[in-house]
């Protein structure tokens, strides 16, 4: 089974970018709260 590298990269970015964005927002909110 051939693995499509571009598909893997696209999937990784599609998952990691929103996760990192939400994590940054969460940290900023926690810092502002305290």
From Swiss-Prot:
Transmembrane spans: 5-25
Matching InterPro entries: PSII_PsbM (IPR007826), PSII_PsbM_sf (IPR037269)
Compartment list: Plastid, Chloroplast thylakoid membrane
Top-level taxon of origin: Eukaryota
GO cellular component annotations of the record: chloroplast thylakoid membrane; photosystem II
Gene Ontology process terms (BP): photosynthesis, light reaction
A Pfam family reported for this protein in Swiss-Prot or TrEMBL: PsbM
Keywords: Chloroplast, Membrane, Photosynthesis, Photosystem II, Plastid, Reaction center, Thylakoid, Transmembrane, Transmembrane helix
Membrane topology: Single-pass membrane protein
Quaternary state and interactors: PSII is composed of 1 copy each of membrane proteins PsbA, PsbB, PsbC, PsbD, PsbE, PsbF, PsbH, PsbI, PsbJ, PsbK, PsbL, PsbM, PsbT, PsbX, PsbY, PsbZ, Psb30/Ycf12, at least 3 peripheral proteins of the oxygen-evolving complex and a large number of cofactors. It forms dimeric complexes.
NCBIfam families, alphabetized: PS_II_psbM (TIGR03038)
Family (UniProt): Belongs to the PsbM family.
The protein's role, per its UniProt record: One of the components of the core complex of photosystem II (PSII). PSII is a light-driven water:plastoquinone oxidoreductase that uses light energy to abstract electrons from H(2)O, generating O(2) and a proton gradient subsequently used for ATP formation. It consists of a core antenna complex that captures photons, and an electron transfer chain that converts photonic excitation into a charge separation. This subunit is found at the monomer-monomer interface.
Listed name of the protein: Photosystem II reaction center protein M
